[in-house]
Amino acid sequence: MSLLTEVETYVLSIIPSGPLKAEIAQRLEDVFAGKNTDLEALMEWLKTRPILSPLTKGILGFVFTLTVPSERGLQRRRFVQNALNGNGDPNNMDKAVKLYRKLKREITFHGAKEISLSYSAGALASCMGLIYNRMGAVTTEVAFGLVCATCEQIADSQHRSHRQMVTTTNPLIRHENRMVLASTTAKAMEQMAGSSEQAAEAMEVASQARQMVQAMRTIGTHPSSSAGLKNDLLENLQAYQKRMGVQMQRFK
């Protein structure tokens, strides 16, 4: 795996699924391929994106700044600086300075990532802030190692939280989660339908599922009643995809 592919993989792992993720993936590909060279416009676009957390925007802004060639005097952006200040915690800043001194002696991507993984996400973000604000300089490879370690720390905590939700025994949370999954599966079916022959059938199944979820939310139902809805919908989607020759993997 090339360095830029690895960076793209780690950065995208912390962005919630949806149309915005696809859009960001495209921007990253363009930036890494040297097709997008207007850093100012790129940062303005990033600043106004909804859904993304300030830290995610800060990390993306850092990656864009590292990759897109720009004039030396180009102003640093406040939204990136604020996101990469380690929540203003002096403890994070102290650790960031210690980490920076170690990274300064490092020259490889993997070496930098390895060193960085023993620090908290707050300290890692602060260290990125030091480099972003030109208070310290490291090689681009080392900076990317720092980025990937930060994303890994964030993705780990997101995964733990997701796993807790999936394995929860609280019937109300499980019920709501099944209904949300049914809604997103319905949306996926509608998007895939396009102009194929089976489009009408897919749209019909998706529409029924949406109405069912709406009704369940409006009148309230027993928490176990949504299990069948989600399973039926996934079976319908699988059958539809088989006919279309599309792999199911993407929706598991």
UniProtKB/Swiss-Prot annotation:
Topological relation to the membrane, as annotated: Peripheral membrane protein
Keyword terms of this UniProt record: Host nucleus, Membrane, RNA-binding, Viral matrix protein, Virion
Gene Ontology molecular functions: RNA binding; structural constituent of virion
Compartments, record wording: Virion membrane; Host nucleus
Coiled coil: none
Region entry RNP-binding, spans: 165-252
GO cellular component, one term: membrane
Ranges where the record places region Membrane-binding: 1-164
Similarity-based family: Belongs to the influenza viruses Matrix protein M1 family.
Remaining remarks: Most abundant protein in virion. When expressed alone can form virus-like particles in transfected cells.
Name of the protein this chain belongs to: Matrix protein 1
Gene: M
